[in-house]
């Protein structure tokens, strides 16, 4: 009887404690709870109009990728020009905003990117012509900086101005390095 009591007690305890990490009232921001709640809120409340306004006609810098930052210019007509770490050229692709259903059946606004000229999509590692879509709030959480217009001239370039590294440079730092003043 004693041998059965402890495994049953352990099983009951683990079932009752499952999921406490995320919903614990004593959790602080160090464990990621506040960040996850902010992303969940952004995913639930970002409208398609807000998502489009966030990136349309903007140069934006994403730092969420484990492979380092990537820089985009998302033109208002749906074209996307992307500069990825390790790439010697600017990738020409497309962006769109769509509404889909999440795992709980709730409507969620998504940002989708694809690069039809590429064999492999630089983010998802699937076929380049396949749309890679993520909840807009999640994507925007990893974008620390945006600038109006094509401030790095990505739409007019085929070659990257220099190789991006793992270090996160600001848009101003990237611009200064990509377009150095002429020597006099």
Predicted regions, residues:
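Bacterial N-terminal signal peptides that target proteins for export
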Residues: 1-8
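C-terminal motif of bacterial Sec signal peptides marking the signal peptidase cleavage site
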Residues: 16-19
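Lipid interaction determinants
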Residues: 21-92, 98-184
